[in-house]
């Protein structure tokens, strides 16, 4: 292997190409810095006035220092990229591509423009990643325990996506097969989610419209909210938290059940279009509330309330608890209606 330290190019580039492992401690170039090796380890501080590019056929290890480019910063590894107590900074874009990428709690990635992280296997983030424009993270398994911030768009895409940290963008898109959120997923504008199964005890929210598509199960004990309209489409919904769309709420599902302490609310209109509905807790709308179901049941402690009109259409309606409307209430049960409220 090649072990180098304190490399300086005051009037040009630094180019390093090793057939074996390459280890460099401290480098400075007014131009570009390029490092290639069978494996690459960088310690200390590395600064490029131009692009900074590191590529390895195996692993890249970054520890206890900084990588700083006035232009683009690019890391490409055939194996793993490891970031330990390391700060990456780019005047333009940052790109990380590897089979596995890990970032510890003491590390940061900052770019004036875009940040793209692509892991063909696992991506684990525990530190802070901040993009002046767009942030994109994709992996087969993405475990996000840190802070991801984008001043423009943030997009996460993974087969398995686990978030216990904070993700925030001016707009936010989430794509996965299974998604678990015990942290926060926030958008300053619209939020779009497309997944099979979504489990959350944290907070998912947007100032703009929220569109959620869960082809399997959605289970929430946390907050799922929009200051604008919220549209939720799922196979099965278990709602034991807060589900709210300030300017409208629409839920379409095969089954919907809400728990005793749940709040399902819109300041505007609400439509529940569900085959089988079992409601407890609070279900309320400032405007018209419509429930369209094959089978509807409300528990003794359930509150079904509308600031204007309440419309219930079902084949089988079994109503307990409170049903109330400020204006008109219409209950249409084509086969069976029981009321014990």
Annotated model-derived regions:
Residues 1-4, 8-15, 20-24, 28-34, ...:
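Extracellular beta-strand scaffolds
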């Amino acid at each position: 292997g090649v072990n180098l330290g304190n490399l300086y190019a005051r009037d040009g580039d630094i180019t390093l190409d090793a057939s074996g492992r390459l280890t460099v401690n401290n480098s400075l170039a007014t131009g570009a810095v390029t490092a290639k090796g069978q494996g690459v380890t960088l310690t200390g501080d590395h600064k490029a006035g131009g692009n900074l590019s590191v590529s390895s056929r195996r692993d890249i290890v970054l520890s206890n220092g900084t990588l700083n480019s006035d232009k683009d910063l690019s890391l490409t590894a055939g194996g793993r990229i490891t970031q330990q107590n390391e700060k990456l900074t780019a005047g333009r874009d940052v790109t990380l591509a590897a089979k596995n990428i890990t970032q510890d709690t003491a590390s940061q990635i900052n770019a004036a423009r875009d940040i793209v992280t692509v892991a063909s296997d696992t991506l684990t983030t525990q530190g802070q990643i901040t993009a002046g424009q767009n942030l994109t993270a994709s992996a087969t398994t993405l475990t996000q325990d840190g802070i991801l911030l984008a001043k423009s768009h943030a997009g996460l895409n993974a087969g398995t996506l686990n978030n216990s940290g904070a993700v925030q963008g001016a707009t936010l898109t989430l794509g996965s097969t299974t998604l678990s959120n015990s942290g926060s997923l926030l958008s300053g504008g619209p939020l779009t989610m497309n997944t099979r199964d979504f489990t959350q005890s944290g907070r998912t929210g947007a100032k703009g419209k929220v569109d959620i598509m869960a082809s399997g199960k959605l289970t929430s004990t946390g907050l799922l909210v929009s200051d604008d309209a919220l549209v939720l489409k799922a196979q099965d919904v278990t709602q034991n938290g807060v589900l709210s769309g300030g300017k409208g709420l629409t839920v379409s599902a095969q089954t919907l059940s809400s728990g005793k302490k749940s709040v399902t609310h819109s300041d505007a209109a609400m439509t529940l279009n569900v085959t089988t509905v079992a409601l407890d807790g609070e279900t309320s709308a400032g405007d018209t509330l419509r429930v369209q179901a094959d089978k509807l049941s409300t528990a003794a402690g359930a509150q079904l309330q509308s600031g204007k009109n309440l419309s219930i259409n079902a084949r089988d309606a079994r109503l307990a608890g409170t049903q109330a409307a400020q204006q008109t209430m219409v209950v249409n049960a084509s086969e069976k209606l029981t009321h014990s409220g």
